Amino acid sequence: MRLRSCPQSQRMRHRSDTSRRAADRGFIWIVLLLGVASTPQMLHSQYRKWSITAAVGYNRLNLDAVDEKNQSDVDGWGNQGIPVGTFASVRRSPFYSAGVRYRYDREFAISLTASYWSKTVSSSYDGPDAELHLDRGVGSTDVVLGIAYYPSVRPYFLEWYIQTNLGLAMARASARAVGSRMQKDGSVLIPVLFVDTEGTSAKSKMSAGLSMGADIRLFSGFSLTMAAGYRFAQLGILESDITRFGQHSNEPTTIEFDYSGVLVSAGLLFEL
């Protein structure tokens, strides 16, 4: 029996088809591997975004000692025959903040925020026998580093988070008293200063806090952001620069300042 051999052209065509199929399979595997490898990066890329925030808020701080000292001064002047009015409380005031945030992944973000608040209250007495004007002020500039955790369970229309904060509180306080009494100079009454005192105090100290917040997306790249939390910032005794009738001195305050308290805010977030 004679065996029929395949022509040379058929053997070459068979090897060519086999090589082509192997190349196609290799290309498919490369595409699949690249897709699998790039999936985590694609998921990260949708969260790795910078954003800026701007907000206004309201704080309620533990400045009861300041209110009590102000009332004590009012009572003291009243005992001297100068019935000045009562001071308003300094415990509640608005604040303003701005910051940047970096969303690292689906669960974590870091932020750096600066905030400012200040409040001044006044009291006075204007009578035929004397005049007295009193001013008291408190305030603080804060720089805060926050680390936020976004739980996996959350509604589709908002992202809520829990955040720990570590910051630097740069506190300040001020006091001013200017008063004069009417005295006779011959047959004429003239005002004579009996008090002219001004003092400024400042101190910086680390603060810590815990807050909860939520971002509600309004449209692409633009969200409403809200937050509420508590800050620990016990400043204690402040060093004061005091001027009495033009004479300067450095003295510690007679009360402790506690800038701890509750803060709530609302603002806007812009994705970059």
Give, region by region, the residue ranges found by the protein language model.
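Cleavable N-terminal export/targeting peptides
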Residues: 1-49
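Short glycine/proline- and aromatic-enriched beta-strand/turn motifs that initiate or cap beta-hairpins
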Residues: 44-103, 263-272
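Gram-negative (and chloroplast) outer-membrane scaffold detector with strong preference
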Residues: 46-51, 58-60, 101-187, 218, ...
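Flexible, solvent-exposed loop segments that connect beta-strands
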Residues: 64-87, 117-140, 170-204, 237-257
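Transmembrane beta-barrel architecture of outer-membrane proteins
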Residues: 91-95, 140-144, 205-209, 223, ...
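Predominantly the C-terminal beta-signal and adjacent terminal strand-loop region
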Residues: 218-272
